[in-house]
Amino acid sequence: MKKILSIVMTVLLVLSVAVMPASAEADKTLKFGEDGKFRILQFADIQDNAFLEYATYQFIKDSVAELKPDLIVLTGDNISGGGSPTKTLAKFGIARFMSIFEKAGVPVAMVFGNHDSEGLANKEDQMAMYQNYDCFVGCEGEDLTGCGNYNLPIYDSKGEKMLYNLWMIDSLTYNRHPE
């Protein structure tokens, strides 16, 4: 009986490992399609408050459906920090458009603009909110001024050779030079 139980447990262990991806990063590899194309859809200055305007929501949703991008890049002022003054409202505002991308299964990268952190949710708080989405391929970054400095390699259709390397750089909130 012990031998049978041991065999069953071994088979279950092998099967459970076999269906797991090699790593979380393997699922997020950006690569060209078999057609040799890689389409990036950029949204800038969405900048609505926590209650995303219906027209904006529909425009984003329709654009993703029609253009079928391989990557979506949000290039700042993704929320209106002043219009989403609390962390809860910032999270709700981010969820309104990220839910579209998550449902479509399209990878998303982002950088911050000067209005994103005007409320109580700072950039680090917001980065953590974005990282809760499976479709998000960005990160906080290390050893550089700002939050969200990272690169995204884009590989050929086989995922073997890096063809492009996109850099996401935090331009900081406002340009402040010491006197």
Predicted regions and their residues:
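Sec-dependent N-terminal signal peptides of Gram-positive bacterial secreted proteins and lipoproteins
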Residues: 4-22
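Active-site-proximal flexible loops/turns
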Residues: 9, 49-52, 84, 120, ...
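Active-site micro-motifs of SAM-dependent methyltransferase domains
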Residues: 15, 48, 80, 116-117
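Residue-level signal for beta-strand positions within conserved beta-sheet cores that form or flank
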Residues: 20, 36, 162
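Extended active-site neighborhood of metal-dependent phosphoesterases/phosphodiesterases
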Residues: 26, 93-179
